[in-house]
From Swiss-Prot:
It catalyses: N(2)-formyl-N(1)-(5-phospho-beta-D-ribosyl)glycinamide + L-glutamine + ATP + H2O = 2-formamido-N(1)-(5-O-phospho-beta-D-ribosyl)acetamidine + L-glutamate + ADP + phosphate + H(+). Keywords: ATP-binding, Cytoplasm, Ligase, Magnesium, Metal-binding, Nucleotide-binding, Purine biosynthesis. Its EC number is 6.3.5.3. SUPFAM superfamilies: PurM C-terminal domain-like (SSF56042), PurM N-terminal domain-like (SSF55326). Belongs to the FGAMS family. Monomer. Part of the FGAM synthase complex composed of 1 PurL, 1 PurQ and 2 PurS subunits. Pathway: Purine metabolism; IMP biosynthesis via de novo pathway; 5-amino-1-(5-phospho-D-ribosyl)imidazole from N(2)-formyl-N(1)-(5-phospho-D-ribosyl)glycinamide: step 1/2. One of its GO terms (molecular function) is phosphoribosylformylglycinamidine synthase activity. ATP binds at Y53, K92, D495, G532. Mg(2+) 1 binds at E94, N533. Part of the phosphoribosylformylglycinamidine synthase complex involved in the purines biosynthetic pathway. Catalyzes the ATP-dependent conversion of formylglycinamide ribonucleotide (FGAR) and glutamine to yield formylglycinamidine ribonucleotide (FGAM) and glutamate. The FGAM synthase complex is composed of three subunits. PurQ produces an ammonia molecule by converting glutamine to glutamate. PurL transfers the ammonia molecule to FGAR to form FGAM in an ATP-dependent manner. This is Phosphoribosylformylglycinamidine synthase subunit PurL.
Length: 743
């Protein structure tokens, strides 16, 4: 059958599909003829960064992905990690950045929908969600509109679907003015012996379309997600998908019910590049060809072309390879749930991806070259220069320490996120044990009296910009520390690597060095990367975002009754710092928000100290000796103490007389591998003796009690004043009140 080409393939059309001239030449060499318009769209979708990872694949292979608990690492819809008793946790984080900037509500909502599908495609029931959000500076004219839309979209979809949002991040910086970041995380629980993969097996088997009908929404979405923005941004609004969480809930239940029947050979959700990507991935992974008949695809719009059907990113859709004898049983399940079920093709043995529409073959391409043998680049990169050292004695001390602390806890980036997370259902399913606002979200595992999972998401972009290698290490270390601070054992992580244009050697250098740092930290902390996502070209008019390699992790609590919270201290408890005295002010929020400076190097991450100190803290919590615990990160010791006091409603009397160094470095330094513990007075000596025996540095800081945070003669702030300052920034900002400077 000859393939006729009705639309001329011009250089402008090729460039409009995000394909470079040498990539188009590669297509001509591969197929020996000019591609059809539909084929051009298929190559464009499969060879862009979003689907092929062509600029990042070389470096992602260097990450540690295996461990004693890892059941499934990268390459599937989500990672799978053993949590004992025949159960496993299935999780992943991925970005929906570009759509969320163009259409914040739907962009964020469908980001949540997509990540939930990745989890339940594997056979897991979602139990927790998180999101890491980055916006432009607060006084930028679009920021409030974007915050409102994204938060509503995340909440609207997650709440309706019925999954608790248990954690996340929200930060502001001028470098996100033109490209916000929406990184969505989901985790689910499955049986370890009942995981479903996307690799097709067997020739001549039916390829089945499941879920909602196909429309024109999202056509070209994957290509848009692999491009820089410019003034034509508003024209891209039609490429944003529209989500329906109630359909997705039905799809979840139908899929899990179908998976019980033994009918499913392979299953893949339709995400980026829709039907194209899901069909190609299933076939290429299984070394099979796929034949699709588009006339059988359920559509909700008239006169859709083959190009539109292949590249539509309509939501709530799945593709499956089915046991033929179970067809009627499978169809009955989907009809019961009010969803479409259509056999749209079959597996073949010719390694071709063939598409037929209205009796005409509109695509006939080598499937491996679209899938796992797509182009891969070793892009040129250069190391980033590092800022000069910044000794603490060269950094000005505040005139008023109490005022400086209030400035930090009431700033755009350190203030309470209550306004955000109160719009999310944090309690649905009835298993949430720790809600947003602490170090990590904690969710009980259904059916077990004591087992729970801890979740955290972290990155400090200002560190990554100053030193991508140390910043990559720090993102992993802080995530590991936040999980540890609940008493959980960190099991594994997922990464969401957000960067600018990889064709610029300095941006590619940030990426390469951050990945090297992430890899080193994951190896040192036994914290493998089991899934992830890369989002490149986050630039507008040549201005790149801050490099933002978000790390989300999962930890296991064998007994949640012994977990620690940040606000559970009792009157009379002793306050102990684990780790060294603060000394590092480079790239600190004190420097940025109080002194309006971005100088100095990122703090160094001593991974041996992280491991030693964290393992000790976890043992104290699991032995039932800690009443509260908090890791020390942005804002240093002062902000950590303030957050613990605000969370517990109990004052702290702190004495720094034994500490060595300048007071502003002790209080606001952001040295790593540090925690604040509170322990009952009668076990304080025992805990300190154990720390000494384990070679863990510690400092006795003071006592819990009263209604104020008192630090020597430097700070004396009533908890209520701290709370009022901490809680007011976000509502004031969203209602357009007060001073809204980000810095």
């Amino acid at each position: 059958m000859t393939i006729s080409n009705t639309i001329p393939i011009t250089p402008e059309l090729i460039a409009g599909h995000g394909l470079k001239p040498d990539e188009y030449q590669r297509i001509l060499d591969l197929i020996g003829r000019e591609p059809t318009f539909t084929e051009l769209g298929i190559f464009s979708a499969m060879w862009n960064e979003h689907c092929s990872y062509k600029s990042s694949k070389k470096w992602l292979r260097t990450l540690p992905t295996k461990g004693p608990r890892v059941i499934q690492g990268p390459g599937e819809n989500a990672g799978v990690v053993d949590i004992d008793d025949g159960d496993c946790v299935v999780f992943k984080m991925e970005s929906h950045n570009h759509p969320s900037y163009i259409e914040p509500y739907q962009g964020a909502a469908t980001g949540v929908g997509g990540i939930l599908r990745d989890v339940f495609t594997m056979g897991a029931r979602p139990i927790a969600a998180m999101n890491a959000l980055r916006f432009g500076e607060p006084d930028h004219p679009k920021t409030r509109h974007l915050v409102s839309g994204v938060v509503s979209g995340v909440g609207g979809y997650g709440n309706s679907f019925g999954v608790p949002t248990v954690g996340g991040e929200v930060e502001f910086d001028a470098r996100y003015n033109g490209n916000i970041l929406v990184n969505a995380f989901a985790a689910g629980i499955a049986k370890s012996n009942a995981i479903f993969l996307s690799e097709a097996k067997g020739v001549g088997l039916p390829v089945v379309y499941l879920g909602a009908k196909t429309g024109r929404d999202g056509v070209g979405g994957a290509t848009m997600a692999s491009a820089e923005f410019d003034e034509s941004i508003e024209e891209k609004r039609p490429t944003v998908q529209v989500g329906d969480p109630f359909t997705e809930k039905c799809l979840l239940e139908a899929c899990l019910e179908l998976m019980q029947t033994g009918a499913v050979i392979a299953i893949q959700d339709m995400g980026a590049a829709g039907l194209t990507c899901s069909a190609v991935e299933m076939g290429a992974k299984g070394d099979l060809g796929i034949l699709l008949e588009l006339d059988k695809v359920p559509v909700r719009e008239e006169r859709m072309t083959a190009y539109e059907m292949m590249l539509s990113e309509s939501q709530e859709r799945m593709l499956m390879v089915l046991q033929p004898e179970k067809e009627e049983q499978a169809k009955a399940i989907f009809v019961k749930w009010g969803l479409d079920f259509a056999i749209v093709g079959k597996t073949t043995d010719d390694l071709r991806f063939r598409v037929v529409h209205q009796g005409e073959e509109v695509a006939n391409l080598p499937i491996k070259d679209l899938g796992d043998q797509a182009p891969e680049y070793d892009r040129p990169w250069r190391e980033c220069g590092k800022p000069a050292p910044l000794p603490a004695n060269l950094v000005a001390a505040p005139k008023n320490y109490g005022q400086a602390l209030l400035q930090l806890v009431g700033s755009a980036n350190q203030s309470s996120r209550r306004w955000v997370y109160e719009q999310y259902d944090t309690l649905i399913q009835g298993n949430s044990l720790q809600l947003p606002g602490g170090d990590a979200g904690v969710v009980r595992v259904d059916g077990h009296k004591s087992k729970a999972l801890a979740f955290s998401s972290d990155v400090t972009p200002r560190y990554v910009e100053a030193d991508p290698f140390e910043g990559g290490k720090q993102a992993v270390a802080e995530c590991w520390r936040n999980i540890t601070a609940t008493g959980a054992e960190p099991l594994a992580a997922t990464d969401n690597l957000n960067f600018g244009n990889p064709e610029k050697p300095e941006i590619m250098g940030q990426f390469v060095q951050a990945v090297k740092g992430i890899g080193e930290a994951c190896r040192a902390l036994d914290f493998p990367i089991v899934s992830g996502n890369v989002s490149l070209y986050n630039e507008t008019n040549g201005v790149a975002i801050l490099p933002t390699p978000t790390i989300a992790g999962v930890g296991l609590l064998p007994d949640w009754r012994k977990m620690a919270r940040i606000g559970s201290a009792n009157d009379g408890d002793k306050v102990i710092m684990i780790g060294l005295d603060g000394s590092h002010l480079g790239q600190s929020v004190y420097l940025r928000d109080v002194l309006d400076s971005r100088e100095g190097p990122a703090p160094e991450v001593d991974l041996f100290a992280e491991r030693r100190n964290g393992d000790f803290v976890r043992s104290v919590i699991r032995n039932g000796q800690a009443t509260a615990c908090h890791d020390i990160s942005s804002g240093g010791l002062a902000v950590a103490l303030a957050e613990m006091a605000m969370a517990s409603g109990k004052g702290l009397t702190i004495d720094l007389d034994e500490c060595k160094g300048a007071p502003h470095a002790l209080l606001f330094g952001e040295d790593q591998a540090r925690y604040v513990l509170t322990v009952p007075a009668d076990v304080a000596d025992f805990v300190c003796a154990n720390a000494e025996g384990a070679g863990v540095p510690f400092r006795r800081l003071g006592t819990v009690g009263g209604d104020a945070l008192v630090v020597g003669d430097l700070i004396a702030l009533p908890i209520q004043q701290l709370r009022d300052t901490h809680e007011s920034w976000f509502p004031d900002f969203m209602e357009g009140r007060g001073e809204l400077a980000a810095e």
